[in-house]
Amino acid sequence: YDHISWLENKTIDGIIHEKTVKLLNSNIFVNQQENKDIALKIEKALTNNQSNKYFFGKDFNILKAENGFIQYQDSLGEVLLPEPNLLGDHQLGNISTAIATSRKLFNVKDEDIKKGITKIELKGRLQELKSPSKLKDLVGQNRLIIDGGHNIGASRAISNWVKKQNEDVHLIVGMMKDKDHQGFIDYFKDVVKSITLIDIPNQEGAISKEEFKNKLKGVNKEIYLANSIEESIKSASKYQNTIVCVVGSIYLIGEVLNLN
């Protein structure tokens, strides 16, 4: 539903129409939509498109296997892959789409896929900042995770990752004005130890931390306000055995990376 305000038809069907109506007939179309009903709508919308079409769950698939391995499968066969270096189970769908596209378009060897899957770099998506730096110094022995996701799908994916962690997670959030602030926070209110709201520097379209807090209802924990990225990270890092997680906007993550 990102950027739906720009659309005349603000329904799933309207979004699918805008996404598919101008697609050219090409060599390949790969779709990673996991919702079967939506995938069927997309497939129907592409009836007259002459591209070779490949749909997740139908033409290719990926599953978690034992001991951290993952199993990829398509018409070319199965590949047992090592655990990827991306955090979050939601990335498996993205990985499978990349593999499907590569195997259909290029003569990629299985061994190259196995090597590549352990060397993926994806900035700002459950990215852990590990190298010595200004912000890493603030968290000390704790972990610092950043994610620029700003929609409900992102908050669901990040919160699912949070649930699987052994450490307490302290959330730092800054968002733009036009996002679903309540819906975003709702996924975290019962799974994180604390929530700190901050302004996004240098962004006129960002919601202020005060307005953000006033909009939130039914959050059964104290919501803190911090005056800067550094202050919020330092405050959340006073606890030991902690994950400090900064989320809510790619603009915010850009500022974090600039500081780092």
Report residues per predicted region.
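Structural beta-sheet core signal
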Residues: 30, 171-173, 197, 246
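Nucleotide phosphate-binding/pyrophosphate-handling subdomain across enzymes
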Residues: 1-3, 75-194
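Active-site-adjacent alpha-helix immediately C-terminal to a catalytic or transition-state-stabilizing loop
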Residues: 254-260
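Active-site-proximal loop/hinge segments that shape catalytic or ion-binding/gating pockets
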Residues: 249
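C-terminal helical cap/extension that packs against the catalytic core
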Residues: 34-52, 66-68, 139-146, 152, ...
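Hydrophobic side chains in well-ordered alpha-helices
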Residues: 19, 42, 158, 184-185, ...
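Acidic, Mg2+-coordinating active-site environments of NTP-dependent enzymes
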Residues: 1-81, 95-114
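A structural preference for short, hydrophobic beta-strand core positions in alpha/beta folds
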Residues: 55-56, 128, 224-225
